[in-house]
């Protein structure tokens, strides 16, 4: 029995990444719409700290495609990738005379959707 693989979407989600969504979006905009192999090369050589979790998530999505659908990694491209704001870690920095200044440590959620390259 032949299954229709043209409409399958492969997803991977990373939540509560300890980075600002603004800084992660700077990297994500460079790989949106590219093939899996091109995105790997771009992420390998970019000097930003946000590249590492995106690289791990991209390889996880490709492994999902291979394990769940039996698809080759060379036939995949990034159809959707989005970065959403997560929760803030709230901390206080002690200041003079008993005061405390709030510190907000941002997190983000990254979602990658891969699809099969059209022939």
UniProtKB/Swiss-Prot annotation:
Its subcellular locations are: Plastid, Chloroplast
Q: InterPro entries of this UniProt entry? A: Ribosomal_uL22, Ribosomal_uL22_bac/chlpt-type, Ribosomal_uL22_bac/org-type, Ribosomal_uL22_CS, Ribosomal_uL22_sf
Q: What is this protein called?
A: Large ribosomal subunit protein uL22c
The UniProt entry, under PANTHER family, shows:
CHLOROPLAST 50S RIBOSOMAL PROTEIN L22-RELATED, LARGE RIBOSOMAL SUBUNIT PROTEIN UL22M
| Highest taxon of source | Eukaryota
Task: Write out the entry's keywords from A to Z.
Answer: Chloroplast, Plastid, Ribonucleoprotein, Ribosomal protein, RNA-binding, rRNA-binding
Q: Which Pfam families match?
A: Ribosomal_L22
Q: Which function does this protein serve?
A: This protein binds specifically to 23S rRNA. The globular domain of the protein is located near the polypeptide exit tunnel on the outside of the subunit, while an extended beta-hairpin is found that lines the wall of the exit tunnel in the center of the 70S ribosome.
Mind telling me which HAMAP family this protein's record contains?
Ribosomal_uL22_B
- The gene it comes from is rpl22
Broad class of where this protein is predominantly found: plastid
Classification via SUPFAM superfamilies: Ribosomal protein L22
**GO MF term list:** rRNA binding; structural constituent of ribosome
Question: Could you provide one GO biological process annotation from this protein's UniProt record?
Answer: translation
């Amino acid at each position: 029995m032949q299954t229709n693989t043209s409409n399958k979407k492969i997803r991977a989600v990373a939540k509560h990444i300890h980075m600002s969504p603004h800084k992660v979006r700077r990297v994500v905009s460079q790989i949106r719409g590219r093939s899996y192999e091109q995105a790997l090369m771009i992420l390998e050589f970019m000097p930003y700290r946000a590249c590492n979790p995106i690289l791990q998530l991209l390889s996880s999505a490709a492994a999902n495609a291979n394990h769940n659908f039996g698809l080759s990694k060379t036939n995949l491209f990034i159809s959707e990738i989005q970065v959403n704001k997560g929760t803030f870690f709230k901390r206080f920095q002690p200041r003079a005379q008993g005061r405390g200044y709030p510190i907000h440590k941002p997190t983000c959620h990254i979602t990658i959707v891969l699809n099969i390259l059209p022939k």
